[in-house]
Structure formats: structure tokens, C-alpha cells
Amino acid sequence: MSSRQGGKMKPLKQKKKQQQDLDPEDIAFKEKQKADAAAKKALMANMKSGKPLVGGGIKKSGKK
């Protein structure tokens, strides 16, 4: 038998995250990941709106 019966249980406390010392390489890697995520988000938005993924496509010449 537990001392708590019914009601809402309190959430467990989590330890505070320690601040890590980041190298310049780590900072550059995180910025690259952010840029890739932003580019992917923009690409997905273009796909949803129906825009073509590539600009070229098949070019038809006027000559026969």
C-alpha cells in the first residue's frame, strides 16, 4: 500500500544540465546542422505549395 492514493502524482525532478565547453568545430557543426534543417524546411514548403523542385526541366527547341 502506498501513502498516495488517487490524485495527481508529482513529476520527478530532473538534474540540471551542465554547460559544456564547446570547441570551434562543435559550434561550426551545430550551425551547419541548423542551416541544413532550414534548407530542408524550405524545400518541404516548396513541395507542399506545388513548385517544381528543379528549375531546368526539359527544354524544347523551336527547330524540328
Curated annotation (Swiss-Prot):
Region (Disordered): 1-38, 45-64
Bias (Gly residues) ranges: 53-64
Record keywords: Cytoplasm, Nucleus, Protein biosynthesis
Pfam families given in the database record: TMA7 (PF09072)
GO cellular component, one term: cytoplasm
Subcellular location(s) per record: Cytoplasm; Nucleus
Biased composition (Basic and acidic residues): 27-38
One BP annotation, GO: cytoplasmic translation
Quaternary assembly: Interacts with the 40S ribosomal subunit.
Additional record remark: Present with 3100 molecules/cell in log phase SD medium.
Family, as annotated: Belongs to the TMA7 family.
Protein's job: Involved in protein synthesis.
Protein name: Translation machinery-associated protein 7
Lineage, highest ranks first: Eukaryota, Fungi, Dikarya, Ascomycota, Saccharomycotina
Chain's gene name: TMA7
